[in-house]
Structures are given as structure tokens and as C-alpha cells.
From Swiss-Prot:
The entry's keywords: DNA damage, DNA recombination, DNA repair, Nucleus
Oxidoreductase in keyword set: no
Name of this chain's protein: DNA repair protein RAD59
Organism name: Eremothecium gossypii (strain ATCC 10895 / CBS 109.51 / FGSC 9923 / NRRL Y-1056) (Yeast)
One BP annotation, GO: double-strand break repair via homologous recombination
Length: 204
């Protein structure tokens, strides 16, 4: 069991159909799009605080207008915030898939000479995992126009992956909000985030 996870399944009863031997089954818990421990809830809160401080300055001076967060926060800034919130070894990301979805070629005349330009559209899917098992996935997009087809391919893939990573980090806010709503409504019945009503009874 992870040092950051305190989940118990001792009171859960499992049933199997004909021909199913329960002792041969291995219980696997999915922490996709939900916190695996109170550690991740706290750390995601710290990340969100940094994001809100950063965006407040941008929106306050109205330099960019009300664009989406993924447009106004550079990737390197979000990575820095993630390192500060989770620790350098507290999170990791992996590019699950990168696809080139469209390629267009056209000519532009400049100073009397025709220049070929390639517009490449790419899509990437990235998975981000915290050290306690909490994980999420997001899809990023990019469109790059360059005179070199190879350079356009490479940059489009890179920027699509960066966009997906940003969306992963920004999606944590919604994950925690949904989690807190479930805790408040006693959605969880066991483990660290079990029913608050049950917890209140135990504390009496």
C-alpha cells in the first residue's frame, strides 16, 4: 500500500458467479480522475492557489482579456508550479498518443519568389500521474505553419503534447471540486473518504 494512500477494503463483500474463484482475483483500484489520498487533495489545492495567483495578475491588468487558462499560462510556468506543489519526484507525465490529423501545402509569393508552406495539425493524448496514484488524461491540439515539412511535423507534435500536459494540470481543479461534492454527499462508503456520517458516529 502506498505511503500516501490510506484506503481499507476490509468491510467490503465480493460475490462471484459460477466458475469464478474469488481467491484468484486481484483487486485493482482506479484513481483516474479522483484523488487517491488526502495528500493529493492538499497538493492539488496548493497547485490551484499558485494558478489563481498567476492568473489574477493577468486578468487584473486586462492584458489578454478573458481567454481560457490554457491560452494565458505558458507550459513552463505550469510545470514550475507542479514541481513546487507536488515535488520534483511527486508527479510524472507520459505521452500516450500523438497523431497528425491534417497536412496542407500552399505557396506564398515573397519578393517575387514562391515559398512553399506546410500547415500541420496534430493531436496528442497525455497521462499525468501523481505519486499516490491519482491520475488524469487530456487531449491537446496544435496547428503549425512552417516552410519545412519536417520541422512543421516535429513542432506540431511537440506543441500538441505540451497543450495536453497543460490541460491535465488545469483539470485537477475540477477533479477536486467533484471529489469534495461526493464526500459531502456521502458518495464514498469505505476507505479514507468514507461517509462523513459514519465518521461522525465513530467520533462520538
Amino acid at each position: 500500500m502506498s505511503d500516501y494512500t490510506n484506503v481499507s477494503w476490509d468491510n467490503v463483500t465480493y460475490y462471484g458467479g459460477n466458475g469464478v474463484a474469488l481467491d484468484e482475483l486481484e483487486l485493482k483500484v482506479s484513481w483516474h480522475n479522483r484523488p487517491a489520498s488526502s495528500w493529493s487533495v492538499r497538493r492539488i489545492g496548493a497547485l490551484q492557489h499558485k494558478i489563481e495567483q498567476y492568473t489574477f495578475k493577468i486578468y487584473h491588468v486586462n492584458r489578454y482579456g478573458k481567454h481560457s487558462l490554457s491560452q494565458v499560462i505558458p507550459t513552463h510556468v505550469l510545470i514550475q508550479f507542479a514541481n513546487e506543489a507536488f515535488g520534483y519526484n511527486g508527479w510524472s507525465s507520459a505521452v500516450e498518443e500523438v497523431l497528425i490529423t491534417d497536412v496542407k501545402q500552399r505557396e506564398r509569393v515573397r519578393d517575387g519568389a514562391a515559398i512553399e508552406l506546410y500547415t500541420v495539425t496534430a493531436e496528442a493524448r497525455v497521462k499525468l500521474t501523481l505519486q499516490d496514484g491519482t491520475n488524469t488524461e487530456a487531449t491537446g491540439l496544435s496547428k503549425i505553419t512552417l516552410p519545412s515539412k519536417g520541422d512543421a511535423y516535429g513542432k506540431a507534435k511537440k506543441e500538441a503534447s505540451a497543450d495536453a500536459l497543460k490541460r491535465c494540470l488545469l483539470s485537477f481543479e475540477g477533479i477536486v471540486i467533484e471529489h469534495e461534492q461526493k464526500v459531502a454527499s456521502n458518495y464514498y462508503t469505505d476507505g479514507e473518504f468514507g461517509s462523513r456520517k459514519a465518521g461522525d458516529k465513530r467520533d462520538r
